[in-house]
């Protein structure tokens, strides 16, 4: 098997449990590439997961004053390796990369069994450009079902906007007509 990021050949490691359960090791990365992704540690904002803090960050304090409670969960820091991953996955359309975080995401999503997963949609233009919805593909690869409740207005891509432009953008999503909204939703 080859690493999905660097193409290096990886040796298959057979374990007793993988033989007994007839499961393959689902690692898609070599140890070198895997080590470039940094998990978020204990020092983080409890609301948005911004690293290096142990209390609510300034952004979350601002949103809280505005009446918006931020509840974001992240597993990894957004370092250069993650930026490169998302560039290849989203902008280059490397569909195979959906498998890279499938097992990690699967373990994390198990914590939210009582929630219904709702995937943020792409605009029609963005879907046509990319050929697939990246979040749908990640959730599928992790083995979870999701609800299709939202639509998106056409607008300029978020990736082409500055941070201040993104913060000033009107919410581009709306609920499809005739759908039932579950009580607990995970976006």
Predicted regions and their residues:
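Glycine-rich phosphate/pyrophosphate-handling loop used in enzymes and phosphotransfer proteins
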Residues: 1-187
């Amino acid at each position: 098997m080859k690493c999905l990021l660097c193409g290096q050949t990886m040796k298959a490691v057979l374990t007793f449990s993988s033989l007994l359960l007839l499961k393959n090791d689902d690692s898609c990365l070599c140890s070198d590439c895997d080590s470039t992704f940094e998990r978020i540690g204990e020092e983080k904002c409890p609301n948005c997961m911004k690293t290096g803090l142990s209390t609510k960050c300034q952004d979350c304090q601002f949103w809280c004053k505005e009446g918006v409670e931020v509840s974001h969960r992240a597993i990894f820091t957004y370092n250069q390796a993650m930026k490169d991953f998302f560039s290849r996955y989203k902008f280059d359309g490397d569909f195979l990369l959906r498998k890279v975080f499938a097992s990690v995401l699967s373990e994390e999503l198990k914590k939210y069994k009582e929630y219904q997963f709702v995937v943020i949609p792409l605009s029609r233009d963005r879907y046509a450009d990319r050929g697939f919805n990246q979040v749908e593909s990640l959730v599928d690869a992790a083995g979870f079902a999701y609800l299709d409740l939202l639509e998106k207005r056409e607008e300029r891509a978020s990736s082409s906007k500055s941070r201040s432009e993104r913060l000033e953008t009107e919410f581009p999503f709306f609920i499809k007509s005739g759908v039932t909204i579950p009580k607990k939703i995970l976006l």
